[in-house]
Amino acid sequence: MSTILVLHGPNLNMLGTREPEVYGHETLADIDDRLRSKAAEKGHHLLHLQSNAEYELIERVHEARAEGVDFIIINPAAFTHTSVALRDAMLASGIPFIEVHLSNVHAREPFRHHSYFSDIAEGVICGLGSQGYDLALKAALQRIHR
């Protein structure tokens, strides 16, 4: 059994109510429950954490390394464009990851076009709403089984 960690960055706790025209009506709990169920169906364990605090996400990445987490799916949200520290934690962990964004960041404000994570990620999925998480989980499981 492999372990996958899903990390959600700032403001994602507001899913379902925050700008639903951009982010959709599904809540973060809906997404996490669906992912956990899909992972369990395949015989894997899925953990998740949402935090508005950069240091909590960094500490969780450090813990993931010590726990032997096999893969990370991360939506760094606003930290995508600002967090060198979280990028460094991802690199230091050595855990492969996929970057996910609910909206198409390339069709939004120019400051959202740059990511500190894309060049070190296994892949990037954006603009597909919560389905992006499902696709990331599918890809993560395929990579784990290689």
UniProtKB/Swiss-Prot annotation:
Top-level taxon in the UniProt lineage: Bacteria
InterPro entries: DHquinase_II, DHquinase_II_CS, DHquinase_II_sf
Keywords, sorted A to Z: Amino-acid biosynthesis, Aromatic amino acid biosynthesis, Lyase
GO terms, biological process: amino acid biosynthetic process; aromatic amino acid family biosynthetic process; chorismate biosynthetic process; quinate catabolic process
GO molecular function: 3-dehydroquinate dehydratase activity
Enzyme class: lyase
Pathway where this protein functions: Metabolic intermediate biosynthesis; chorismate biosynthesis; chorismate from D-erythrose 4-phosphate and phosphoenolpyruvate: step 3/7
Pfam families: DHquinase_II (PF01220)
Marked site (Transition state stabilizer) residue numbers: R18
EC number(s) stated in the UniProt entry for this protein: 4.2.1.10
Active site location: Y23, H101
The reaction(s) this protein catalyses: 3-dehydroquinate = 3-dehydroshikimate + H2O
Binding site residues for substrate: N75, H81, D88, L102, S103, R112
Record PANTHER family: CATABOLIC 3-DEHYDROQUINASE (PTHR21272:SF3)
Protein function: Catalyzes a trans-dehydration via an enolate intermediate.
Subunit structure: Homododecamer.
Family to which this protein belongs: Belongs to the type-II 3-dehydroquinase family.
The protein's name in its UniProt record: 3-dehydroquinate dehydratase
Species the sequence originates in: Marinobacter nauticus (strain ATCC 700491 / DSM 11845 / VT8) (Marinobacter aquaeolei)
Taxon lineage: Bacteria, Pseudomonadati, Pseudomonadota, Gammaproteobacteria, Pseudomonadales
